[in-house]
Amino acid sequence: MGRAFEYRRAAKEKRWDKMSKVFPKLAKAITLAAKEGGSEPDTNAKLRTAILNAKAQNMPKDNIDAAIKRASSKEGNLSEITYEGKANFGVLIIIECMTDNPTRTIANLKSYFNKTQGASIVPNGSLEFMFNRKSVFECLKNEVENLKLSLEDLEFALIDYGLEELEEVEDKIIIRGDYNSFKLLNEGFESLRLPILKASLQRIATTPIELNDEQMELTEKLLDRIEDDDDVVALYTNIE
């Protein structure tokens, strides 16, 4: 991954440490999961994962419980919507939102793109084929070692659950599999009693591009505006 990417990720992680921004997005994911599959984590894998990701960000239990209860109230009237856009330098953007007001959401997104010359929202389906959807799980390397497993053991154990790729990054291990293998991979971790640090469904560009520092700085202004929107829960680009 290029220096511009690392600069962007470092800047984003620093800003996302502001819990006032992170918690509402996590709460929306919990509420929607509970609304779709019920309020019991034991029987709702999507809710279980949303709670796990919230705990990884130190979200208080009271906030988590409140988000689950919200699913049965009028406040829980959320829907998932995906938007696509293009920016300068060949940048492609896919934006995943959870919103109770799609009209507001698309109006806000269009305003962000309009502030960036050369950027625009495009019809849904225009860019989706240029991204692969993947299940991505993270765990700590020392948790694997605590189970007396080598990386080869872990890879072999999870292949039958849909593992496609295993990568070691510093103190973490990243597992990737097909989008449709999310539930199965989750079951694989549970069968090993291996704690999951983070789990998500991601979109990975089939043909990533590299930007220089100046191009990245200009592009990040748009990406920051998008990610700051409370209705946006995930943003993917083709930037390497």
Curated annotation (Swiss-Prot):
Domain of life: Bacteria
The keyword Zinc is annotated on this UniProt entry: no
UniProt-annotated location(s): Cytoplasm
Tagged with keyword Transcription: yes
MF-aspect GO terms: DNA binding
Broad class of where this protein is predominantly found: cytoplasm
Gene3D superfamilies per the UniProt record, alphabetical: 1.10.10.200, 3.30.70.980
Keywords of the record: Cytoplasm, DNA-binding, Transcription, Transcription regulation
GO biological process: regulation of DNA-templated transcription
GO cellular component: cytosol
Family per record: Belongs to the TACO1 family.
PANTHER family assigned: TRANSCRIPTIONAL REGULATORY PROTEIN YEBC-RELATED, TRANSLATIONAL ACTIVATOR OF CYTOCHROME C OXIDASE 1
Protein's UniProt name: Probable transcriptional regulatory protein HPSH_00820
